[in-house]
Amino acid sequence: MGANMDDYTRMGYSPEAVCEYVMTLLNSNYEEWHMQNPDKNYRDFPFSIKKMSVSGCLFDFGKLNDVSRNILSGMTAEQVYDGLTGWAAEFDPEFAAELTRDPEYTKSILAIGRGGKKPRKDLAVWSDAKPYMGFFYDRYFAVTDSIPDSFSREDVNAVLAGFLDSYDEGDDMNVWFEKIKRIAAALGYAADMKEYKSDPQAFRGSVADVSMFIRVAVTGKMNSPDLY
């Protein structure tokens, strides 16, 4: 693997992720077993020397990152908070101070998109957290992405004005998104993606584009946790 556990810790990999990945290298049937036993961890696996590869194995960082995303996405917000702040305290003290200034606020951020059948898998290593969630903190907010020039400034400004005028903190997700769809339709953007895909030339864009305008304005990024 070319590195010891301290190196992987410094890079931000959780020990659980590294151990999980190593098991996929050591025993050819580990992944199949884990799919059949999703609630168990590598310590429960019936390891067999007979299942070890006789030709050795190649380390693959891409596969490690995939495994790590699965591991971190399956953690609770509390577990992610503990792992992230523990890593940051040693390797990014300034970030650790921001994270721990208001633990409940940080945990509420980490809870976004977590749980359910399809949890978000944005984090592969703890060091991914700052660029991913930094916009929630004044110290780290920065506009890193811009709205493509193919969209008119007038449309963008109209969307943002409409969003501000209609925003109500008490709205649930469905009401919130319905308002965005109405803004889109009023400006000639398709409110329904199926309708847009069937005849894209009939619209100025889609509700996905309108949502992107809002996302970039609020977060400075094209990719972020769920805006709602």
Model regions: which residues?
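Catalytic adenosine-cofactor/nucleotide-binding cores of aminoacyl-tRNA synthetases and other
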Residues: 1-142, 219-228
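A diffuse structural propensity rather than consistent per-protein peaks
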Residues: 4, 48, 60, 125, ...
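Amphipathic alpha-helical segments within well-ordered protein domains
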Residues: 5-6, 65-68, 85, 161-164, ...
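Generic detection of long, well-ordered alpha-helical segments
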Residues: 8-15, 74-78, 150-153, 157, ...
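Residue-level detector of well-ordered alpha-helical segments, enriched
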Residues: 17, 63, 80, 176, ...
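Short, functional N-terminal and low-complexity linear motifs
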Residues: 47-54, 143-148, 166-167, 206-213
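Charged, gly/pro-rich, cysteine-poor intrinsically disordered low-complexity regions
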Residues: 99-184, 190-193
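Charged substrate- and nucleic-acid-binding regions of tRNA-handling and nucleotidyl-transfer enzymes
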Residues: 178-228
